[in-house]
Amino acid sequence: MTKRLTEVAKKAGVSEATVSRVLNGRDGVSEATRTAVLTALDVLGYERPTKLRGERARLVGLVLPELQNPIFPALAEVVTGSLAQRGFTPALCARTIGGVSEMDYVEMLLDHQVSGVIFAGGSYALADARHDHYRRLTDRGLPVVLVNAGVDELGFPRVSTDDAVAVEQAYGHLRSLGHERIGMVLGPEGHVPSRRKLDAMAQAAGWDDDTAYVERSSFSMEGARVAAGKLVERGVTGIICASDVLALGAIRAARRLGRVVPTDVSVVGFDDSAFMTCTDPPLTTVRQPIETMGQAAVDLLVTQIEGAGVLHDELLFEPELVVRGSTAPAPGR
């Protein structure tokens, strides 16, 4: 008990006596101090006293698929900073291979009486994945916001980059450079954002049969290298990728096949992750408006937490084409 009092007091910036008064439900403690102590208790993983468990903490979960892709730490920075400014403590939950699953994180967050959860890049974006844990949040009436496209039946508010506009920008750029054989490296078959990108590409390019121009991959550099290599071998000179990580894999594939980027093959990414100006060549990509989207996600969540209604719909944000050194006129132009 003494260790717990000491740790909670240090985390909350108050005395151990104040922590004791809060935990025992005594008077003489301001609401702000009481909230700080309970939040510290939640963050440190201690259970609340039984009489306090019915109240939700000012703790918000941010569940990410990974931290290796630079776009997710960038989003986390925006979301956690915005939450802190609104008086909430963020709990960052990042999945790892063989580690804690998204379902497990949901259970942990529910046990800690969180006020709400923001998901980015979770299994909600995969049509063939399990979604039971999301429905548990709905059953509990817990505020939830999703970042980027997900399956429609979940019905949570979403903030998304407009995938159709992103593809139109990338395709238009490559066409303006004279490329005619333009392919795509996308995520898995059931990945909703990739599906949207493919639909937009089919419309823009007038595809009836896309099998020769589309390859799918896990969101890894090695997976993209294999997928993009098949496109290059089929004579594709421009490749649009569903993420910057996939684009880096595509550049590696072209080089292994003796092609020069961008002289022989042009590559366009998606995200504009950190350090894309430092790649060789610097990556042409479509920038997601992460700061605006992160702020909007927090606004939607806090509005729900405060008891106001929000439209359980999707807010679409327009991306921006950023032209760098990985695209050039088609060979022979």
Question: Where are the regions a protein language model picked out?
Answer:
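Short gly/ser/thr-rich secondary-structure transition/capping motifs
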Residues: 42-47, 100, 126-128, 251
